[in-house]
Amino acid sequence: MSKKLYIKTYGCQMNVYDSVKMQDLLYPYGYEPTENIEEADVIILNTCHIREKAAEKTYSELGRIKKLQDARKKQGLNSAIIVVAGCVAQAEGEEIFTRTPYVDIVVGPQSYYNLPELISKVVRHEKHLIDLDFVEEAKFDQLPEQLYPQGASSFISVQEGCDKFCTFCVVPYTRGAEFSRNVEQVYREALKVVSSGAKEIMLLGQNVNAYHGKTSDDKVFTLADLIRHLVKIPNLERLRYTTSHPIDMTDDLISLHGLEPKLMPFLHLPVQSGSNKTLKAMNRKHDRDYYFDIIDRLRKARADIVLSSDFIVGFPGETDEDFADTLDLVRKVKYGQCYSFKYSPRPGTPGATRTDQVPEHIKSERLTILQKELAAQQLAFNESCIGSTMKVLFDRDGKFDDQIIGKTPYMQSVYIKNPNKDLLGKIIEVKITKAALNSLSGEIYR
C-alpha cells in the first residue's frame, strides 16, 4: 500500500523546483503525491523567509496541521510526519522545534536530498531531526532525475545562492554562496524534461546571470554560453531565465536577446529602488543611470523586449524625495508587470539594525501609490495587445470545463474556450480580443 506525501510550497520558483525534487526523491520509497493533506503520511512545508509575513505563514499553517494531528489522534489514526523545509528552516533552525515541538524534521534548501534518511529515522521513532548543511555540490549530485512530468513549461535550477549581500536580503544566509551546476547536469535535465513534453524551460537562480558552470573538460560557461548550448535541443521552443541582477548583465547576454529567437522577449530585472541614495544603502552595487543603460541596451538589442522588476518601498532612511525617484524610474522605464513590497526587516541583515526605520503607515501609503502606477502600466501594456496575434503556450486547464490557459512570450495569461483540451502542451497563434489587469482573452487565429 502506497504512502501519501503532501507538499505545500511558499515563495519563489526555486522553491517550486525544490518541491518537485522532494517529490521525486521520495517516490522510490513509496510516497505518492496527494493534494489532500488529511490523507498524508508525510507533510512538507517548503518555506520562504524573504519577508516576515511569508515566514509567519509557516507557523500559521503549522498551527492548522497541529489541529489536524490532534483530530487524527482522537480517531486512533497515526500522526503524519511533519517536515519544515526551505529558507525558514535554514534561518530559524532549532527555534522551530521550540515554537512548534510537534514538528519532526527541519531541513535546509541545500540538504533536503537527505529527506529519505531523515524520514526513515522518524519512522524508527527518532524526533527533532535537523539538517542545515551547505553543500551545494552534494545536493545536485544526489538529486534524482525527473520522475513526474512538469508539463509544457519546466523549471531547471542552474545556479543557487548569492554573493551580493544586499542589506535587506536573507538569501546569502539561507541559500549560501553563489554556486553553479555543471553544464552536463543541466543539459541532461533539460533533455529529460523536453522528452517528457516540455516546450519551454525556465532557468532558475538567485542570481542566474552570474552562472559560471563548468563543462566536463573544465571549460567555464556563462549564462549566455549555456543558453546557446540548450537551444540546440530538438523540440525545445522557448527559453527563459530568472532572477537577474543588473550588474551581471553582460554584453554577450544582452546581445543574445537580439540573436536567439528561442530566448523569450521578456526579462525580470529587479532594481528595488529608483533612488541612488537608497540603492547605495541597499548595497545594490549600481546606480539608476547604470540600470537605465542596461534597459536601453536591451531594447536596442531587441525592440520588442518587455521588462518586469521588483521594488521595495520604505527601506530605512527612504525620504519622500527618494520615493519620488522610484516613481520617476518606473515612469521612464514603463514595465509590463512588476512586484512591489513594503520593506520587512529580516533578522541578521544590516538593514534590520538601522535606527532610521520608516513608519509603517508611510510604507503603506507609498506602496499604494507605487502599485497604482504599476497597475496602470500593466493594464496599458495588456490593452496594447488587443487585436494582435500572439503565440501562446497552453499549459493548464481553466476554471471552467471548456476553458484552457496559456502564456504569451511576455508571461501574460491567456484564456480561450477549447472544449476538447486538445491544445494543451502546444504553441498556437491566438488573436487577443480582451485585456484585463492580470490576463488576456482570445480566440484561435484561423
From Swiss-Prot:
From the Swiss-Prot or TrEMBL record, give the protein name. Answer: tRNA-2-methylthio-N(6)-dimethylallyladenosine synthase
Q: Which SMART domains does the record match to this protein?
A: Elp3
Give the main EC class: transferase
Q: Which GO terms describe its molecular function?
A: 4 iron, 4 sulfur cluster binding; metal ion binding; N6-isopentenyladenosine methylthiotransferase activity
Keyword Lipid metabolism attributed: no
Positions of [4Fe-4S] cluster 2 binding: 162, 166, 169
Subunit comment: Monomer.
Catalyzed reactions per annotation: N(6)-dimethylallyladenosine(37) in tRNA + (sulfur carrier)-SH + AH2 + 2 S-adenosyl-L-methionine = 2-methylsulfanyl-N(6)-dimethylallyladenosine(37) in tRNA + (sulfur carrier)-H + 5'-deoxyadenosine + L-methionine + A + S-adenosyl-L-homocysteine + 2 H(+)
Q: What's its job? A: Catalyzes the methylthiolation of N6-(dimethylallyl)adenosine (i(6)A), leading to the formation of 2-methylthio-N6-(dimethylallyl)adenosine (ms(2)i(6)A) at position 37 in tRNAs that read codons beginning with uridine.
EC number(s) for this protein?
A: 2.8.4.3
Top-level taxon of origin: Bacteria
Q: Which cofactor does it need?
A: [4Fe-4S] cluster
